[in-house]
Curated annotation (Swiss-Prot):
Protein name listed in UniProt: Hydroxymethylglutaryl-CoA synthase, cytoplasmic
Protein family (similarity comment): Belongs to the thiolase-like superfamily. HMG-CoA synthase family.
Pfam families: HMG_CoA_synt_C, HMG_CoA_synt_N
Gene3D superfamilies linked to this entry: 3.40.47.10
Keyword Cell wall biogenesis/degradation on entry: no
Catalytic activities: acetoacetyl-CoA + acetyl-CoA + H2O = (3S)-3-hydroxy-3-methylglutaryl-CoA + CoA + H(+)
Keywords from the named record: Acetylation, Cholesterol biosynthesis, Cholesterol metabolism, Cytoplasm, Lipid biosynthesis, Lipid metabolism, Phosphoprotein, Steroid biosynthesis, Steroid metabolism, Sterol biosynthesis, Sterol metabolism, Transferase
E.C. number(s) listed in UniProt: 2.3.3.10
Localization per record: Cytoplasm
Role, per record: Catalyzes the condensation of acetyl-CoA with acetoacetyl-CoA to form HMG-CoA, which is converted by HMG-CoA reductase (HMGCR) into mevalonate, a precursor for cholesterol synthesis.
Modified residue annotations for N6-acetyllysine: 46, 273
GO biological process: acetyl-CoA metabolic process; cellular response to cholesterol; cellular response to follicle-stimulating hormone stimulus; cellular response to low-density lipoprotein particle stimulus; cholesterol biosynthetic process; farnesyl diphosphate biosynthetic process, mevalonate pathway; liver development; male gonad development
GO MF entries: hydroxymethylglutaryl-CoA synthase activity; isomerase activity; organic acid binding; protein homodimerization activity; small molecule binding
Amino acid sequence: MPGSLPLNAEACWPKDVGIVALEIYFPSQYVDQAELEKYDGVDAGKYTIGLGQARMGFCTDREDINSLCLTVVQKLMERNSLSYDCIGRLEVGTETIIDKSKSVKSNLMQLFEESGNTDIEGIDTTNACYGGTAAVFNAVNWIESSSWDGRYALVVAGDIAIYASGNARPTGGVGAVALLIGPNAPVIFDRGLRGTHMQHAYDFYKPDMLSEYPVVDGKLSIQCYLSALDRCYSVYRKKIRAQWQKEGKDKDFTLNDFGFMIFHSPYCKLVQKSLARMFLNDFLNDQNRDKNSIYSGLEAFGDVKLEDTYFDRDVEKAFMKASAELFNQKTKASLLVSNQNGNMYTSSVYGSLASVLAQYSPQQLAGKRIGVFSYGSGLAATLYSLKVTQDATPGSALDKITASLCDLKSRLDSRTCVAPDVFAENMKLREDTHHLANYIPQCSIDSLFEGTWYLVRVDEKHRRTYARRPSTNDHSLDEGVGLVHSNTATEHIPSPAKKVPRLPATSGEPESAVISNGEH
């Protein structure tokens, strides 16, 4: 066919394109799910056991999607001593929409102003919880295309997941993850191994532009999630089997071939059920299952059809029990952030990746294949895989990315526990004020983590102004400008901590860098 390459043609791509660095941000306060059970008057264990959730992070009216993303981007740049001119693509995945026209990415460009770097491709990508993964794929595709100019891509996934009071509220959360994408990475995207499923469904959607709350069909949402997992896993297995056959290896792919398996996590119990679901797929796909000891006791389920089992309690119970050890080995560690902070929508699955990288040594991770299932309602889903580099030596890229996340658990533990009634008051405040113009947030900034960007005001034209709570690493904004090396030998740019010019502080606010998404 004209314009097509022959199937056996080989192209030349940059080597080992993947995740070079990762940063995660979550707010400084949470509500305890056991206390929330008491406050809501539900049975003990409904949230903690039934959903598998221990704590739920939330933000006050001082934080919005722009401030979350400003914070996580600047923290990634600072932690890795990166210059802002080394970014050639910046894309945001989010479903937290505060402006139907102006992108979150355009707000983030304020961090790049003093560097003079405005030649940055990318924009916002939205489809429920899948937008972050779509942005990641766009970044990888850019680096592997003729458009690539040799610089890094930066992907930001972030959301504020909140629900109206009721059964869905304990499945909320908030957070953002920034991923630096480039060649020679320690966590590499497996080329040609994506299993995708797209379908029209009204399982979860947000049609009311004046509300942050979604419309949710809980039962349909679970069915859509599990059916998408079935389809994506089937496509992935076919693609990797085809690759293996080209390499002379004739075998079926199973869960055992993943070193780790991570999922988009609306709540932890669904992830455990999903791992069991993949085990069910392996079982039904194994022509010799009667001879395989790992399926002992499951013989009665040999004739079930996947589409008939979404809510079959007997199947669910049997395969969760049979896959319990696999869950402990391959998935349980990935639920640290989800269990302690809740659902972060687009950044949820990348919080799971951060959890794995934070809890295993480079030596334990080296050479492992990580399965990743990303799901967004509506619906869009992909199962793909990452391959961890073999180089786990001190000072290696793998050593650096794990070291940068080693404080994850202590950061989660350093948050402040807030009483359920205070949490409910904050949710009501957001409900009443998130859409207002000419608004000054009411909550204090004193409880914010150092280095957190926060909302200062929304003016009469809905233009938002932000400031950053000073960090001990900032020293003084008046003590000259620190320098970090760019990726060229002759250039220097101001340190990321000094990117934004300081404006006079508003009444009652500490002096700090201030930026606005309106006129300066």
